[in-house]
Design a protein with these regions (language model features):
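Short, glycine-/small-residue-rich phosphate/pyrophosphate-handling segment
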Residues: 109-152
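Beta-strand-loop-alpha "switch" segments that mediate conformational coupling across diverse proteins
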Residues: 155
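N-terminal beta1-alpha1-beta2 submodule of the flavodoxin-like/Rossmannoid cofactor-binding fold
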Residues: 1-105, 110
């Protein structure tokens, strides 16, 4: 059975991201072993730039994201559902992504990756916004999420 990570990045309970997440979770039932992150319900901090991950594998912070590195390493697919705020990501998603600095440093500074770089992984992002559509509406979010997905070797 495949392993999936589903991230609901909305700070709003019962909003669009929740409905989309529920739909996706129903479709994955019985087809995937799912780790479901509802970021608004989790207690964690962003990167504090302490430098620990530049000298050691992993992150010194022990909170609800502590197992994130293992979960992403074991995953076959990652699905992120997020609203757009001022062309960007909600703060908790950005804080989670900033904590992936430990993965980046393990790969490129320590050359001892926390993520199996040979394992193929798939990723999907569902973004939605309330503003009238305009050409660059999703670019800020796309840029940040591209870095996140690259850090976990996901296309």
């Amino acid at each position: 059975m495949i392993k999936a990570v589903v991230i609901n990045a909305s700070p709003r309970k019962s909003g669009n991201s929740s409905h989309i997440s529920e739909y996706i979770m129903e479709r994955l039932e019985g087809k995937a072993e799912v780790t479901y992150y509802v970021l608004r319900e989790m207690e964690f901090t962003g990167c504090i730039d302490c430098g620990y991950c530049q000298r050691n594998r992993g992150c010194v912070i022990r909170d609800d994201l502590h197992d994130m590195y293992r979960v992403f390493d074991e995953s076959d697919i990652t699905i992120t559902i997020t609203p757009i705020y001022f062309d960007g990501t909600p703060w908790k998603l950005k804080a989670m992504i900033d904590r992936m600095q430990a993965i980046y440093n393990s790969k490129y500074v320590l050359e001892d990756s926390l993520i199996d770089r040979s394992k193929p992984r798939s990723g999907f992002v569902v973004c939605h916004g309330g503003a009238p559509e305009y050409e660059t509406q999703f670019e800020g979010n796309r840029n940040v999420l591209q870095f996140m997905y690259r850090s976990i070797n996901t296309e």
